[in-house]
Amino acid sequence: MAISATAALWFLPFVLPICLYVAFTDMKQMRITNQAVLVLTAIFVLLGLFLLPFDTYLWRLLSLVVVLVVGIVLNAAGVMGAGDAKFAAAAAPYIAWGDLRLLMVLFMATLLAAAATHRGVKYTPLRRLAPDWQSWQETKKFPMGLALGTTLGLYLILGALFGG
């Protein structure tokens, strides 16, 4: 993997709780909070400055801007929610350029697993464990925070284990 194990290990304890929070709130309320996105961004801005070479740090910050602009366009087109776009932008700097192909495969697998699990639980008695979740009522929308948060968390875990 292109991400260094050291960077992944430093990011992981701060980022993983946010990923879990985003997955939970998106399933429960169908929204990703601005606070979660801002904290995720702040963690990278603060830790990344010490963990990455300065030129890499700046390129990764640029990826945040690029993903945010693309996300805004996709949101305006009705393809994705605003919270999803903001979270993807805040998550972008954590991803090493050399890991993009791996990330896409990881995201697709996570998205399929999240969709199958969420839809499967929706139609089983397990739904009674959280009967008030808004995502159960949605027919056309899916809580992408479940897949996005899981993808970033798994990526950092894999980076900590197998990073360069």
Give a label for each model feature.
Residues 1-164:
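A membrane-topology feature that recognizes alpha-helical transmembrane segments
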